[in-house]
């Protein structure tokens, strides 16, 4: 008989409701509970989806023997301490991105995983994006030749849904946290590059652009993070030779709702480039349009009632399903007709975490990989604050074999 486990959702915001449906449907998950700082949100989600119950606090959830694992869907700067707290309480942990926002927080997570032997996984969507999957396959086949350069963009304008999202999560003082530094949210760009190119960043130089909107967001006098930068670019050196560049843009004339993360890879024999609606494979003989191979199929109508609390500009991220390049054969059949999201990644994220817990194996985006997706942005942020000075990026090494 297959092992099953129970799961507690931490946070009942815009994201967790989409994932609770998938966790409940997975044959490896027995019961799903939820807690939120606003109890009415937890009660509303539990009632809407028929969850097993609610807890009055995260601490109460961790103390309960009814919960074997937790999935953290809280504000992005809160993850590090919550993850360590969960592992220390004996729970397996799935966490939304980013892993953490300081080097010390990441080190603490890795130490806790090593000490407890419990599962930790960061839910990085771009690891499963069609472009990343295709590039990963082509790299494995040697089609690029020697890969020497790549680019990853996370281009999401604040006007396209982010104001509503920050108001929803931040309450009346939402502007304090809407100024969250772009480079401290690096994984949708870095993860798509390093999810295909098996290397890691060793140094970085980054430049930030000060915001000029003047609406109290990205205002250092208001910002909890002392941040006035809304757009930033980072150039990374990688181990073994080569480089990659990322863009983190929050004020940009670009249709973020069509494709907010996009990637490009360049090798000595071939290259691949992705834009909002077009993707190309190129070699020394010519160009092949691979757009259809990487195009996700919608799994939910944008006006579905389950998306009513999500800004219209953000709904595409919660409806985009698998692309032809995805191999769905390993997914549970229970997912076949369920909503997906973020270019088909949600089904794979849930299945990889559940599989890791039930088989006691390392998930693809384990603590060591998560650090390599997150830490480059933390150091890049510091480089930008120092005017672009080149800084070395520490590394926690490869994940253990078992």
Q: What role is predicted for each listed range?
A:
Residues 1, 9, 69-71, 283, ...:
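C-terminal helix-rich "cap/oligomerization" subdomain common to oxidoreductases
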Residues 1-49:
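N-terminal Rossmann-like dinucleotide-binding module
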Residues 33, 53, 69, 149:
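Short, Asp-centered acidic motifs that coordinate Mg2+ and/or phosphate
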Residues 51-58:
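Conserved SAM-binding strand-loop segment of SAM-dependent methyltransferases
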Residues 64, 68-69, 75-76, 80-128, ...:
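Beta-strand-loop-alpha-helix segment that lines the small-molecule cofactor/substrate pocket
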Residues 90, 117, 142, 241, ...:
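Glycine-centered short loops/turns at secondary-structure junctions
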Residues 119, 126-227, 232:
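Predominantly a Rossmann-like dinucleotide-binding segment in NAD(P)-dependent oxidoreductases
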Residues 184-306, 346-363, 377-381, 395-402:
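Contiguous beta-strand/loop segments that form the cofactor/metal-binding neighborhood of enzyme cores
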